[in-house]
């Protein structure tokens, strides 16, 4: 199972290196990683997606707390969250294909951020499912390049779990 960990750290040099070193020593893979400042000066949030079981995540959490500059580690996998990713896609499209590509882009509420005679660069923001869906649909065209951010996530204060709502339909 994939686990999403939210880690608050002091914004000091070497913190990410120590975390990556811990994962490497234990043989764990980090599937997705996003780091950025929080609302508190000097504090950063690291959001990681780690494929592993519950027991291993518990051990990993304990190991993370032993590192310097780690303030809080939370497995938010089963909590109601808002999740987002950003993807940029460079798409080669002919003049003939452009209208169809733009229709798809509009349906997904994506944005064209650059265009030339033969290429579009598209910005897509959304939950991981939306990102995967538009990538699959646009694969009918020639995708020249793709870059994706790691997943970012915050726990919902409303406690509305949209994942469980989606399973009902």
From Swiss-Prot:
Its EC number is 2.2.1.6. PANTHER family: ACETOLACTATE SYNTHASE SMALL SUBUNIT, ACETOLACTATE SYNTHASE SMALL SUBUNIT 1, CHLOROPLASTIC. One of its GO terms (molecular function) is acetolactate synthase activity. This is Acetolactate synthase small subunit. Its main location: plastid. Residues 4-78 form the ACT domain. Pfam families: ACT_AHAS_ss (PF22629), ALS_ss_C (PF10369). Dimer of large and small chains. Pathway: Amino-acid biosynthesis; L-isoleucine biosynthesis; L-isoleucine from 2-oxobutanoate: step 1/4; Amino-acid biosynthesis; L-valine biosynthesis; L-valine from pyruvate: step 1/4.
């Amino acid at each position: 199972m994939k686990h999403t960990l939210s880690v608050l750290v002091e914004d000091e040099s070497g913190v990410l290196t120590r975390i990556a070193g811990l994962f490497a020593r234990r043989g764990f893979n980090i599937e997705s990683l996003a780091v950025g400042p929080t609302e508190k000066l000097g504090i950063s949030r690291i959001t990681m997606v780690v494929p592993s079981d519950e027991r291993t995540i518990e051990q990993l959490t304990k190991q993370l707390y032993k590192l310097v500059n780690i303030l809080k580690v939370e497995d938010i996998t089963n909590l109601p969250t808002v999740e987002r990713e950003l993807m940029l896609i460079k798409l080669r499209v002919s003049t003939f294909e452009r209208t169809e590509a733009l229709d798809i882009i509009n349906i997904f509420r994506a944005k064209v951020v650059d265009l030339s005679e033969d290429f579009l660069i598209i910005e897509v923001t959304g939950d991981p499912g939306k990102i995967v869906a538009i990538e699959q649909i646009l694969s009918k065209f020639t995708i020249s390049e793709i870059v994706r951010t790691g997943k970012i996530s915050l726990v919902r204060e409303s406690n509305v779990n949209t994942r469980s709502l989606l399973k009902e339909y």
